[in-house]
Amino acid sequence: MSPKTETKASVGFKAGVKDYRLTYYTPEYQTKDTDILAAFRVTPQPGVPPEEAGAAVAAESSTGTWTTVWTDGLTSLDRYKGRCYDIEPVPGEESQFIAYVAYPLDLFEEGSVTNLFTSIVGNVFGFKALRALRLEDLRIPPAYSKTFQGPPHGIQVERDKLNKYGRPLLGCTIKPKLGLSAKNYGRAVYECLRGGLDFTKDDENVNSQPFMRWRDRFVFCAEAIYKAQAETGEIKGHYLNATAGTCEEMMKRAIFARELGVPIVMHDYLTGGFTANTSLAHYCRDNGLLLHIHRAMHAVIDRQRNHGMHFRVLAKALRMSGGDHIHAGTVVGKLEGERDVTLGFVDLLRDDFIEKDRSRGIYFTQDWVSMPGVLPVASGGIHVWHMPALTEIFGDDSVLQFGGGTLGHPWGNAPGAVANRVALEACVQARNEGRDLAREGNEVIREASKWSPELAAACEIWKEIKFEFDTIDYL
């Protein structure tokens, strides 16, 4: 028997408990191109050395358990075990460390985000030796990412389908999110699309409630889309939320949306689950539907900076599981989002190759090879005065989504949509002329409002609205 294949069974089994670091802390290890790499923010319990804590994370998220077991001798642990290969202190924190763990590719089922997360974060977060644990980033090697379909269509194909280029897309979430009848809901959709928006949207918790069953909503929204398209000459869409209590029901709703001829459906990928999301993404590619993704429940997982999982990991997982849009915060609105960190995971969603950049929270260089990109959606507490900043921060390949910032217009829904479209077109034109939107944005909006009474009214109603709270997620 060669040394490489020698097992404990061949040299004698020794029962008992030993430190994780004796087996799973390997600072001499050279990572492979095919390894999945993880960066964990580790807060050990008092008295637990960082090497032991990092090794425990590697062990409990791969092949290890609390004691030596006889069946270790029936396989090659060196081939399959996770390895903590580096540990570094977190600046400014006395008892916090970044532990880097490498996982062999063979630990994971191909094309399954469900299995990936079950292995890496499924059990170890309750480990008693740790006070807190946060997964900050993952490096997904091309050898693994190529086993996923990824987004149903991607950014370029979506633009070609919509015939819309050179600017961000405009959306609106219909409000109130709950309580409208299907017909009144469809009326609001029509008014917003007629006013100049590209998309309207079901809110994340609009599924099939007693006041508005899903089939009725789908029919009235489809009618609104076709009427608005006929009047404006532009392709329009409404994110019909297919999220349901079972995968079978979800697929039934997606199939009905396709039969109506609408361009896009929607899914709540965290509450719905990665298995359901991947199934829906495959259906959408096969049937020409775009897929909008809402991240409902994400803050339960990602908001605490010491424990949980950073959204950049959830964003990478979504790109593999499949989605053409995903909500990504705003930096400037009512929801959490620090600028450099937000732009870091926005690049991870859109770009093919993203260099390691710790200043933006990117721990590993990520190469997506040929996987299509995902459009980030800026949504939450934004209005026309935010348009210059949003255009400058997110660029053309994004969706800017104004719910209350459309439907809260003093003159109604269609004028609210007009105001947003005029503001966007003015900002894009100013940018293309070389003006600095960061410094001149308010002046650009004021100039445009002279020619648009709808925009002028919106500017007046929201001129004092600000959401000024410090972010709690920082590097």
Curated annotation (Swiss-Prot):
Cofactor(s) the protein requires to work: Mg(2+)
EC number per UniProt: 4.1.1.39
Co-factor binding comment: Binds 1 Mg(2+) ion per subunit.
Self-association and partners: Heterohexadecamer of 8 large chains and 8 small chains; disulfide-linked. The disulfide link is formed within the large subunit homodimers.
Protein name, entry field: Ribulose bisphosphate carboxylase large chain
Family per similarity comment: Belongs to the RuBisCO large chain family. Type I subfamily.
Cellular component annotations (GO), alphabetically ordered: chloroplast
GO molecular function: magnesium ion binding; monooxygenase activity; ribulose-bisphosphate carboxylase activity
Source organism per UniProt: Pseudolarix amabilis
Residues bearing PTM N6,N6,N6-trimethyllysine: 14
